Amino acid sequence: MQDHNKKAMAGLTLAALGVVYGDIGTSPLYTLRECFVSQNLPTTPDNIFGILSLIFWSLIFVVSVKYVAFVLRADNRGEGGIMALMALARHYTTHAARWKIVLLGLFGAALFYGDAIITPAVSVLSAAEGMEVVSSGMEAYVLPMAVGVLVGLFLLQRHGTARVGLMFGPVMMVWFAILGILGLHQIIQQPAVLQALNPWHAVTFLSQHGFHAFLTLGSVVLALTGAEALYADMGHFGKTPIRRAWFSLVLPGLGLNYFGQGALLMSNPAAIKNPFFLLAPDWALLPMIALATLATVIASQAVISGAYSLTRQAILLGYCPRLEVHHTSDKEIGQIYMPFINWALLVAVLVVVLTFKNSSSLAAAYGIAVTGTMLITTMLFFVVARVNWRWPLPLALGITLLFGVIDTAFFAANVHKVADGGWLPLVMGMAIFTLMSTWKQGRDILFKRLREQALPLDDFIHNLEAYPPARVEGTAVFLTSTLHGVPHALLHNLKHNKVLHERVVLMTVRTEDIPYVPEDERLEIVQMSASFWRVMARYGFKEEPNVVEVLDKCAKEGFEMELMDTSFFLSRETIVSTGHPGMARWRQKIFLWMSKNALRATDFFQVPTNRVVELGAQVEL
């Protein structure tokens, strides 16, 4: 049994290498180069020691301490990520504080989409730029190669990654091993580079170079891209495999490679043009470019899958309209493909690649998205530590202030890059934030209008008993979001058809602030009268609502509904924009557009289409 557990843990650790660490694992391709090039710093030993020390201790403080030691503790029943953290943070807060937490979480999620666009662009471009090291004449092929790889990657998404995903872990294990070996080879030739392990070199560099050193932090943070993935992917692998992979292979591989690049620059300052690929001997350049391209594809796949997962969570939590979701694996519920998100990402990535043309230009855009998300995570972590865990204020404030100062320094160092490309994730973030907040606000107003117009359910049932209508055989299930009002579809059915079914079931599907709902808490069945029942089905934000599955569970609870004798009634609302206060006109137009393009409720809740009756209803916004 113990051997089996060890094998399972080893398998999860290997799998985590392929998914969690792809992004941060490809950072050595461009980070050290950008630290020097962005500020035109000379490659002197003091500068090399200072920048290496900043990179190394940033990895220790931000990744090892903040994320691995602390943030991974803030799991929402095993799940991580900005949406899970937001749901956890708002769970125990007051109504006034809840909306502020939601706004923070939504903007953090919006910045992640910017990251999902920039990561494939910058990582694949940086791998393709290795061709320039092979021969200066190959420069013209860099952009076409990057575009070809990216188009191929997005075209393959619809087929799923279940099979090729099995190779991700072993490939990244080889990648980190080679990172370490290449770096160690140079360190042996220039052991003096290990002086940079002393944090005093980082302090000296910052004090001697002043404002220029501060701005260099904007490039140092590139070494931390992908740190958020440690937390976001916790639900797939668990804390222990993620921690083991980090300390056993990822951190040593990254550390050795960065120090190896520094050692190379000490012996050959001209190698700054591409210190990563120049670590490799000439005969290994082409295989190294191929491996780097594969590693960047894996890193890109991780953020693309993350974008699908985040969108699905946003839909279930009510911050995004329903979109088409395809399952690409019979075994893993998390393996999904979302056509709209896929093609939107592809178009955005290609526009970014063809606009910026090289990884150095894109590096400026990268930092804002990464540091913004890191800072928001720190803020939400404070709320969880203080409110959920009830940490004493000095402890919660002390730890989060330490992280906050580091995050703020990195973010501030990137602000000056707004004109050079930093505007890209900010514009993307604001656009996506506007869409998500508009959808949430619009749905809240819509539900409020429906509640105001709805008849009280108890009075309605009492009147039906006093003046019974004609009855027809079978069961009618009315899907409704309101608990105490009469569904519009029920009123319209009674008004136009003048009949009711023998059994009337009012079914509400609710998404909770937790990833998974225990099976014994899934259903709540209440008989309201001789012919009326209420069924409440609860799902977590990582689960998939399924109405047929709810019927099966009802049968197990003793409340049977034969599918072929059951009709499902839904309201199909036509939303009309009005001058009512509460929502700006331009937001109303956006909301109407999103509503028209949302996936039908019958498809989203997997209601059998041949058993559905839709009744129109007009609602004023």
Swiss-Prot record:
Gene Ontology MF annotations: potassium ion transmembrane transporter activity; symporter activity
Bilayer-crossing regions: 9-29, 48-68, 101-121, 136-156, 164-184, 210-230, 246-266, 275-295, 336-356, 364-384, 393-413, 418-438
Origin superkingdom: Bacteria
Keywords for the protein's UniProt record, in alphabetical order: Cell inner membrane, Cell membrane, Ion transport, Membrane, Potassium, Potassium transport, Symport, Transmembrane, Transmembrane helix, Transport
Membrane topology: Multi-pass membrane protein
Family named by the database record: Belongs to the HAK/KUP transporter (TC 2.A.72) family.
NCBIfam families found in the cross-reference section: PRK10745.1
Function in brief: Transport of potassium into the cell. Likely operates as a K(+):H(+) symporter.
Protein name as annotated: Probable potassium transport system protein Kup 2
Annotated source species: Chromobacterium violaceum (strain ATCC 12472 / DSM 30191 / JCM 1249 / CCUG 213 / NBRC 12614 / NCIMB 9131 / NCTC 9757 / MK)
Highest classification ranks of the organism: Bacteria, Pseudomonadati, Pseudomonadota, Betaproteobacteria, Neisseriales
